[in-house]
């Protein structure tokens, strides 16, 4: 099994909010950037999107905040594929501190889009092949309870 696609970053001062930790919107930015980097390196670079008149949209996402990050903390995001079909990929990403503490998780559903029609369209074959290969060869994990979690207040 292959190690997951991973992006490493350090918390910059601009990411900090009035509570002294990373602002919630910045978690979503770094998760989105990690998935973009995954896509760029697996067959959907900006140049490939332009040449194919094709792109990929986020159609649903959810982030769970489990621990804090403060300025200068180093963290990494590991990207997993939970599921896919010919025009959708369900990503699950895990953000951890260098000591292994899980900081946040992010679940995102991405949908392939034809720029010509502005409608959903199957993935280009070379990208789908990369998704299938990644999924088949990724490290197997016990999916965290945050996967598929429904926001609710228990009564």
Predicted regions, residues:
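Hot-dog-fold acyl-thioester-processing enzymes
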Residues: 1-58, 114-155
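Short hydrophobic alpha-helix segments
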Residues: 106-108, 124
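Residue-level signal for glycine
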Residues: 100-102
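Long amphipathic alpha-helical scaffold regions
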Residues: 97, 109-111, 115
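Generic short beta-strand
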Residues: 13, 92-94, 110
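Conserved GNAT-family N-acetyltransferase fold
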Residues: 31, 93, 106
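Hydrophobic core residues within well-ordered beta-strands of beta-rich domains
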Residues: 5, 57-59, 75, 89, ...
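Hydrophobic beta-sheet segments that form the core/acyl-binding groove
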Residues: 61-98
């Amino acid at each position: 099994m292959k190690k997951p696609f991973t992006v490493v970053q350090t918390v910059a001062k601009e990411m900090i909010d009035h509570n002294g930790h990373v602002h919630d919107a910045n978690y979503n930015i770094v998760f989105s950037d990690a998935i973009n980097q995954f896509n760029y390196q697996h067959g959907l670079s900006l140049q490939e999107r332009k040449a194919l008149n094709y792109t990929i949209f986020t159609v649903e996402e959810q982030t769970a905040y489990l621990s804090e990050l403060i300025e200068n903390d180093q963290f990494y995001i590991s990207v997993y594929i939970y599921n896919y079909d010919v025009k959708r990929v369900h990503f699950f990403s895990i953000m951890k501190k260098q000591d292994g503490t899980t900081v946040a998780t992010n679940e995102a559903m991405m949908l392939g889009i034809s720029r010509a029609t502005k409608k959903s369209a199957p993935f280009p074959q070379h990208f789908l092949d990369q998704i299938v290969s990644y999924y088949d060869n990724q490290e197997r994990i016990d999916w965290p309870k945050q996967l598929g979690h429904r926001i609710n207040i228990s009564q």
